């Protein structure tokens, strides 16, 4: 076993050197704080080993916000480099590393855990379930994601980051990228992807088997419907990525030749594998985002969602078509006119079900009694901005025109108008919307609105000029340009917009900190002035009790909770409580994550024997779990009755306070 010590430390860049010096101090400081406040046992027992879907969701969201910061810093470094012509702020390879990691982090390690965090917190509550179908697997899934996240971020200070773009095309990612950088990409995404696939299976089964028996599919909230359909995409799309990553890993570590032309390999095989996963991946993050908008818009329009069934069918149509469009990512790679024509038409067809959704949201707003809370502001801003992303997407879908737009900043502007407005706006809106359900208090609305205005205006200032830059011929992934190119002014404006977005995000961080200390606590559950329309708002706030629902709720219409409130009924009015069975916490996922992180690290540096030892550790942990007799535990009916009585009393007091104010 010869570990490549000479590849361990990245040298020659002042930013990386500062990170290498600062990272140990950050870790030591974090350990010191946890030790000082004696939190190790609490964190391990209550969080790291928890199988409670709500706590797992919170851990996903914490990771997602941290990765938002990391990906945002990458974006600011990119904009700093391109602000002025002939800039020497970053050298070319470091710039390549930054735009590569920016894409991976924002898609894989920010957007997906943000969505999965909201799935975990909201979906079981929306369907009347006490937990997900496989609670232990849910914990394992999180730690697989966490292991991948740690490994990928470790690359910045140990070994070097991948520099072949977020698409990691062969042969650039093969023989032309020596060192551990691309290995970090392959192993980290592989480990995280296993967790994602397990999450998809888990929530697919949860929605099918754990929902309240009276809830029919067409009566489910749209966030749950979009989650269910997205899990199907996850189950079908991630295996091709898993295969592609495994093949390239064997190419790099074991000298196979799946993608090496000199030995009979096919680089285009990677492009097809990647985009067979890559374009459905866009809908893996954007369909749940559509579900978030479909919850927020009816709530603050005080109206039933228009065309609920057509929204369900439109979501299914988008999911189906998402597997028929991947070639539009490489129209210029010599596919031929017939193939390009087919994929051009199939790409345009996605605009039809997407248009159905847009019109349904607009018709929901029509004659609604709209109030402009911050989640609603993000949702309203999404519609026109996403429309611009969709229209430019149709332009790019025209294969002949794509030869002009391909690999220019026009494409960069397009997919940011699609993903930032479609996903990031939704994540921020969803976080603010369901934050009181998680924490028991709302985020400060004034600070939230400052966040919205800075972020939304900054977004348009940043990316609108990039359409013009692309039409003017500026290639993407260009690390510098000459004054004679004439791109300085628009790049300067774009950088100013990025700074405004960063300020907007800082307002959200300030809102989270400020609200923790200052916002009034709300334990009753229906936190947005009694406007809740779905089952999660019937439960208590501040992470509802472990069992979620004391009795199985009845649900016989899309807006049953609205009808219940209008007639003064509540599912808690039934006092016939029984003992509730719950699963025990388990350390299995945590230790699998530890073994995956250590084994993945050694495999990245092509040191196979320690990686195999860690693999045996993973199998040993799984075998230990298989032979463990764990029947869970029961919450006594008396304890349930006491908890529900407290919640009922708090709800009555809140109703009396509201009546007194009115």
From Swiss-Prot:
EC numbers: 1.10.3.-
Chain positions recorded as Cu cation binding sites: 279, 283, 328-329
Cofactor(s) for this UniProt protein: Cu cation; ferriheme a
EC main group: oxidoreductase
Entry membrane topology: Multi-pass membrane protein
Key words of the record: Cell membrane, Copper, Electron transport, Heme, Hydrogen ion transport, Ion transport, Iron, Membrane, Metal-binding, Oxidoreductase, Respiratory chain, Transmembrane, Transmembrane helix, Transport
Residues binding heme a3: 414
Transmembrane parts of this sequence: 14-34, 58-78, 103-123, 140-160, 187-207, 228-248, 273-293, 311-331, 336-356, 376-396, 415-435, 451-471, 493-513, 587-604, 608-627
Catalytic activity: 2 a quinol + O2 = 2 a quinone + 2 H2O
GO terms for MF: copper ion binding; cytochrome-c oxidase activity; heme binding; oxidoreductase activity, acting on diphenols and related substances as donors, oxygen as acceptor
Protein's cellular compartments: Cell membrane
Gene Ontology terms describing biological process: electron transport coupled proton transport; oxidative phosphorylation; respiratory electron transport chain
Pathway field: Energy metabolism; oxidative phosphorylation
Domain of life per record: Bacteria
InterPro entries linked: Cyt_c_oxase-like_su1_dom, Cyt_c_oxase-like_su1_sf, Cyt_C_Oxase_1, Cyt_c_Oxase_su1_BS, QoxB
Record location of the 1'-histidyl-3'-tyrosine (His-Tyr) cross-link: 279-283
Major localisation: membrane
Cofactor binding, note field: Binds a copper B center. Heme A3.
Family recorded in the similarity comment: Belongs to the heme-copper respiratory oxidase family.
Its job: Catalyzes quinol oxidation with the concomitant reduction of oxygen to water.
PANTHER family with a match to the protein in the record: CYTOCHROME BO(3) UBIQUINOL OXIDASE SUBUNIT 1 (PTHR10422:SF35), CYTOCHROME C OXIDASE SUBUNIT 1 (PTHR10422)
Protein name according to UniProt: Probable quinol oxidase subunit 1
Source species: Staphylococcus aureus (strain COL)
């Amino acid at each position: 076993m010869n570990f490549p010590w000479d590849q361990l430390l990245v040298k020659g860049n002042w930013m990386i050197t500062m990170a290498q010096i600062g990272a140990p101090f950050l870790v030591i400081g974090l350990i010191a704080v946890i030790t000082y406040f004696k939190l190790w046992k609490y964190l391990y027992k209550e969080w790291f080993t928890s199988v409670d879907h709500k706590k797992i969701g919170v851990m996903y969201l914490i990771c997602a916000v941290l990765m938002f910061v990391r990906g945002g810093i990458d974006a600011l470094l990119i904009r700093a480099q391109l602000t002025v012509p002939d800039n020497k702020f970053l050298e070319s390879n470091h710039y390549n590393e930054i735009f590569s990691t920016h894409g991976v982090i924002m898609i894989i390690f920010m957007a997906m855990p943000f969505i999965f965090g909201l799935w975990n917190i909201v979906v079981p509550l929306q369907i009347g379930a006490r937990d997900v179908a496989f609670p232990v697997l849910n914990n394992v899934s999180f730690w697989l994601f966490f292991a991948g996240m740690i490994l990928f971020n470790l690359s910045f200070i140990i070994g070097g980051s991948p520099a072949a773009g977020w698409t990691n095309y062969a042969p650039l990612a093969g023989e032309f990228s020596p060192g551990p950088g691309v290995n970090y990409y392959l192993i980290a995404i592989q480990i995280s992807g296993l967790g994602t696939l397990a999450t998809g299976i888990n929530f697919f089964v949860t929605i099918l088997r754990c929902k309240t028996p009276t809830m029919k599919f067409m009566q489910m909230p749209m966030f749950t419907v979009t989650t269910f359909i997205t899990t199907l995409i996850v189950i079908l799309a991630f295996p091709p990525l898993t295969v592609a990553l495994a093949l390239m890993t064997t190419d790099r570590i074991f000298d196979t030749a799946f993608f090496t032309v000199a030995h009979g390999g096919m680089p285009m095989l990677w492009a097809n594998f990647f985009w067979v996963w890559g374009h459905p991946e866009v809908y893996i993050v954007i369909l749940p985002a559509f579900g978030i908008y479909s919850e927020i818009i009816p709530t603050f329009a005080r109206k039933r969602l228009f065309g609920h069934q057509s929204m369900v069918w439109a979501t299914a149509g988008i999911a189906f078509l998402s597997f028929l469009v991947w070639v539009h990512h490489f129209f210029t790679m010599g596919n031929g006119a017939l193939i390009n024509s087919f994929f051009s038409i199939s790409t345009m067809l996605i605009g039809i079900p997407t248009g159905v959704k847009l019109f349904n949201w607009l018709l929901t707003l029509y004659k609604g009694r709209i109030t402009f809370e911050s989640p609603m502001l993000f949702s309203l801003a999404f519609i026109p901005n996403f429309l611009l992303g969709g229209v430019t997407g149709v332009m790019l879908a025209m294969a002949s025109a794509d030869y002009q737009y391909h690999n220019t900043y026009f494409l960069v502007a397009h997919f940011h108008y699609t993903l930032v407005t479609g996903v990031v706006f939704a994540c921020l809106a969803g976080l603010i919307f369901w934050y009181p359900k998680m924490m028991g208090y709302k985020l400060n609305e004034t600070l939230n609105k400052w966040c919205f205005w800075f972020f939304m205006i900054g977004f348009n200032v940043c990316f609108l000029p990039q359409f013009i830059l692309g039409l003017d011929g500026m290639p993407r992934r260009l690390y510098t340009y000459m004054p004679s190119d004439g791109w300085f002014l628009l790049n300067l404006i774009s950088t100013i917009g990025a700074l405004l977005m960063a300020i907007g995000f800082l307002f959200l961080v300030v809102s989270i900190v400020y609200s923790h200390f200052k916002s009034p606590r709300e334990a009753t559950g229906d936190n947005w002035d009694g406007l809740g329309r779905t089952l999660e708002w019937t439960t208590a706030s501040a992470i509802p009790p472990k069992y979620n629902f004391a009795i199985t709720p009845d649900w016989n219409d899309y807006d049953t909770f609205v009808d219940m409130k209008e007639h003064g009924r509540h599912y808690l009015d039934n006092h016939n409580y029984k003992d509730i069975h719950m699963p025990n916490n388990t350390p299995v996922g945590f230790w699998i994550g530890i073994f995956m992180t250590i084994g993945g690290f050694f495999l990245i540096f092509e040191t196979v024997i320690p990686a195999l030892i860690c693999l045996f550790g993973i199998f040993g942990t799984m075998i230990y779990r298989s032979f463990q007799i764990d029947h869970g535990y029961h919450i006594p009916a008396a304890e349930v009755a006491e908890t529900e009585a407290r919640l009922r009393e708090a709800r009555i007091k809140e109703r009396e306070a509201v009546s007194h104010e009115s």
